[in-house]
Amino acid sequence: MILPSGIVNHYNHLMIVMKFGGSSVANAERIKHVASIIQAYQDKRPVVVLSAMGDTTDHLLEAADKAVESVVDVGGVAKLHEETAGELGIKIDTIQALLVELKQLLTGISMLKEVSKRSRDYLVSFGERMSVRMMAAYLESQGIPAKFYDAWDIGIKSDSNFMAAELLDEVWDNIPHHLNAYKNGQDNEIPIVTGFIAKDIKGNITTLGRGGSDLTATMIGAAMRAEEVQTWKDVDGIMTTDPRVVKDAKPVPEVTYEEAQELAIFGAQVLHPRSMLPVRKVGTPVRVKNSYNIKSPGTVIVEKHTGKVPPVCAITTVKHITLIDIVSSRMLGAAG
């Protein structure tokens, strides 16, 4: 992605981007909790990026498998969202419309007896699309102005590499065009945006592959020159090591983009390296926060360390690796 020239002057006010994964919005109780977090940051003018609820993606793929066998069934997906909406006390007209659309797609799959990559991306998108509608409706019911957006509504476009699409360069200009009014205070409805999905230039829905929801969040944050991008998880940031293995593991206050990338490559639960690309271009900080410990500062990922650099920031491990050390006199003086 190439950073366009001439867009720097659009950013006179600060804002943040808040990304919540599927486990954070898995049920009504968690949705209420996330809503309370959003409300706590309301004065920061947050843009919220959401994944699909809990196991919705798995339910959608199971529905596709059934459709190939001529069984059209949206029951699992419908039950989860209808029951959750009932517990939240919200109307779900927009979700019902999506369920009708989903049933039509599954009917088409049942006729073709196959799921193409394009159809799979279209299918999977229903999870994120229902999730943002649910959250926006609940926030509104609590007196918090909010509006849901499918990613393409704010100009998030991609190529046509289904299941692993790449964002187009025009996204850098598209996002500010749609969100500047909110950032500058002319619009007060909190944008609730689908993560993970986009549309290509033909209007086909695509998915962004691994780390796709994080990529959506960092792309919005970078394009809008946000104060920071927050990704909310169930730990107090990036830990010194795996807390499941070492009970005394502690959160690391600060790491660089490069350190975060290395940790992610070797298995640490950090942002996918691909999702760091937009923020690295403009230096937008990314903060990993704990949704169950809001007061914890978490870990901030920055371009350069702002204080004393620790000799070792964190340790991660990769299991089931075999090291083979070959020693031979014939290798004397050879590289490697």
Residue spans for each PLM region:
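Glycine-rich beta-alpha junction loops
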Residues: 53-54, 153, 235-237, 284-286, ...
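Flexible, glycine/charged-enriched surface loops at secondary-structure junctions
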Residues: 90-95, 271-274, 285-294, 326
